Amino acid sequence: KDISHVVENFKICAGDAQGDFDGTVFGDGDFYKWMESAIYTAYQTDNQLLKEEIENYIDLIGRAQQPDGYLSTKQIIGERSGNGVSRMGDINDFEVYNFGHMFTAACVHKRITGKDSFLAIAARTADYLEHLYEEAERTGEVQTAVCPSHYMGLVEMYRTTGEERYLKLAKQAIALRDSVKNGLDDNQDKIPLKQHEKILGHAVRANYLYAGVADLCLEEEDPDYIKVLHKVWRSLVDKKLYITGGCGALYNGASPYGYFFDHQLVHQAYGYEYQLPNITAYNETCASLGGVFWAYRMFQLEPKAEYFDILERMMLNTNLAALSLDGKRFFYENMLRRAK
């Protein structure tokens, strides 16, 4: 049963079903992450039924995609119904986040199977992004995507295809952050990226950002970016990380770095240095997953045991403990002590 309605959303986009969009705006990305995991599992265990299911889903994704490469089920269904939903109209619709996880899943599929079917879909979406960034540079109208998985996804596209344009696109996407007007601490775009010194704002967004920057540096070294990565990593590990590897003490709060008379809301976020309460800890599971991505890439940049120590702390405590043994239930947040 499609409890999340994710597959049904793709079927509606592909014309296989009728109905309205339902579920979370990041559901497409969750589906792509499931696809990535399923691909690994199917070919490690030689599960023929799962292999067939994967190929059927790739066909569905391809038929849901628009001619220009765009693919976000909420927007496609909304455009057809005329309910006022528009492409790239709200960064909190997670469109580019979803793209990034599609890129990664498609690369895994190509590497394991040798097939181009999923990668061709991802390439068309990357073409759409390329046109989007060209337009942003031309008009100066730039907004930063939340939880920017596409940085890592585009670097993976480069590694998988060898096409330099994907690395260039990842570099362009990261550089465009500095052109955002009225940026926010919560989205890590209030000041230029190369001025970052402290971990702040939404914890998932932050960890995905620095994981993506580290991925870029693995392919094209940038001393300024590497310096930022080391400074912000120390800010996290020395002053804002829970003993369990939990990331982001606050559910809602005010940015500790906001200007007077410019108090900014932060959500699911890092707080003040050493602000690590037990009962009210938020510690979103997704943030620790982002931390694993980041720590792994820091280790590749600089093979020190500390990075894998932190990776294991996050993965074997917060991440592993957040999932039930039967795989059907999970914790979205991970406090250290529950109060009755």
Q: Which residue stretches match the model-derived regions?
A:
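Glycan-recognition and catalytic cores of secretory/periplasmic carbohydrate-active enzymes
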Residues: 1-340
